[in-house]
């Protein structure tokens, strides 16, 4: 069975997930990963190639069409990347069987165009929370997890617990009240933050009354080593964040860190309040929950053991590999068809950007001048000089 994965790149969580899943695939599955841009980080691409997969960069959109014609299944690794939307809109695809694996939840911006879900033969989410989206056809959609834990067994809780956060250190994802919550703790504590901090996060940390509680350690390529230094994983994310599988949360739980999260959809599908961690309704509730954990070692030990066992039982590469193989084999019985993805996403770069913003999008009062993924600036960076995007920018 020949599977062609069309993806903007293999960086971050997408590449990490595929490297893990590919190692659990049966021998009769051959995977080709066709990248739409040259990779900047080759770690996961090299791991896939070393395991027997083919990894290549598309020369042209005609190259994408040619390789799609040779595959049994074409799987699009979906998120709001400009190059992927260009590929969907401008490639002259042959008849094919299409699967989309969405690495965004679609619950908040960036949204998933409903017509794209309808155009796909199968549309796969990475979180059960996405099944709440309106208008989904049950026969077309599925959920396959992309976040996996570490194999190492959990270690014992310390008498004096330490707190950690690992991930995006920016209010685009981290809740802006994170530092206020740490400041509000009655007891002193040590909090290690792993991830490159934004200017907003740095200002918030420096403005704390108890700034010495915070340690900013930057990015790490050894997350397991970073996490094993802590006992509690404080992971409050802003309510409309774009995350789905939450790899850092899953990894932390797998080695026994007790999570404290907000009741956002993605996190609430991973953490069970009072069983595998603690779930707060609001950021203001977090200091009390943290203090409860810090002062009750028996509770920490129970939740720690439950968290590790839950991840080991439910979130493994083998389970995801089996789920995909079953989905692909089921789709082989269906005759290939010529897709019209352009009708679902639009014809111009401005159409593609707006397709992920919803009907109520309006230009921001303060334009985002950074090329953060999926932003208007990102689209302009990729399609420099495009008239449709310039009109959108002028409106802001």
Regions found by a protein language model. Give the residues of each.
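Glycosyltransferase donor-sugar binding loop
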Residues: 33-41, 190-203
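Nucleotide-activated donor-binding/catalytic signature segment of Leloir-type glycosyltransferases, i.e.
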Residues: 50, 202-220
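Short hydrophobic beta-strand element within catalytic cores of glycosyltransferases
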Residues: 34-35, 257-262
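Nucleotide-sugar-dependent
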Residues: 236-250, 262-264, 268-269
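Conserved acidic donor-binding segment of nucleotide-sugar-dependent glycosyltransferases
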Residues: 273-274, 278-284, 292-297
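Conserved donor-binding/catalytic core segment of Leloir-type glycosyltransferases
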Residues: 4-6, 152-173, 179-186, 192
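C-terminal amphipathic helix plus adjacent low-complexity
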Residues: 313, 318-396
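Donor nucleotide-sugar binding/catalytic pocket of nucleotide-sugar-dependent glycosyltransferases
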Residues: 119-153
């Amino acid at each position: 069975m020949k599977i062609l994965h069309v993806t903007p790149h293999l960086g971050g969580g997408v590449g990490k997930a595929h490297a893990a899943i590919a190692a659990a695939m049966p021998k009769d599955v051959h995977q080709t990963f066709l990248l739409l841009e040259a990779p900047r980080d080759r770690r996961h691409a090299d791991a896939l190639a070393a395991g027997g997969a083919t990894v290549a960069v598309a020369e042209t959109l005609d190259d994408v069409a040619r390789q799609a014609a040779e595959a049994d299944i074409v799987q699009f690794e979906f998120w709001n990347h400009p190059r992927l939307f260009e590929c969907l809109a401008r490639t002259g695809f042959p008849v094919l069987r299409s699967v989309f694996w969405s690495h965004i939840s679609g619950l908040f911006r960036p949204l998933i165009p409903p017509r794209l879900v309808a155009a796909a033969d199968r549309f796969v989410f990475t979180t059960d929370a996405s099944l709440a989206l309106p208008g989904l056809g049950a026969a077309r959609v599925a959920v396959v997890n992309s976040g996996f834990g570490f194999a190492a067994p959990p270690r014992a809780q310390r008498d004096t617990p330490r707190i950690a956060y690992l991930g995006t250190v920016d209010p685009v994802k981290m809740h802006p009240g994170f530092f206020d919550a740490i400041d509000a703790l009655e007891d002193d504590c040590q909090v290690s933050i792993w991830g490159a901090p934004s200017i907003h996060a740095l200002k918030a940390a420096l403005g704390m009354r108890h700034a010495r509680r915070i340690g900013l350690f930057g990015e790490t390529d050894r997350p397991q080593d970073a996490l094993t230094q802590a006992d509690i994983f404080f992971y409050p994310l802003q309510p409309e964040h774009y995350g789905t599988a939450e790899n850092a949360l899953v990894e932390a739980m797998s080695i026994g860190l007790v999570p404290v999260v907000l009741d956002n959809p993605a996190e609430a599908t991973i953490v069970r309040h009072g069983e595998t961690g603690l779930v707060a309704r609001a950021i203001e509730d977090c200091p009390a929950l943290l203090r409860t954990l810090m002062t009750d070692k028996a509770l920490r030990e129970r939740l720690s053991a439950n968290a590790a066992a839950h991840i080991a039982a439910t979130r493994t590469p083998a389970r995801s590999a089996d789920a995909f193989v079953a989905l692909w084999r089921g789709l082989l019985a269906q005759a290939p068809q010529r897709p019209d993805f352009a009708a679902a996403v639009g014809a111009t770069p401005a159409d593609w950007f707006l397709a992920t913003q919803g009907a109520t999008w309006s230009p921001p009062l303060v334009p985002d001048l950074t090329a953060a993924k999926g932003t208007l600036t990102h689209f302009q960076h990729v399609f420099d000089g495009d008239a449709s995007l310039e009109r959108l920018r002028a409106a802001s």
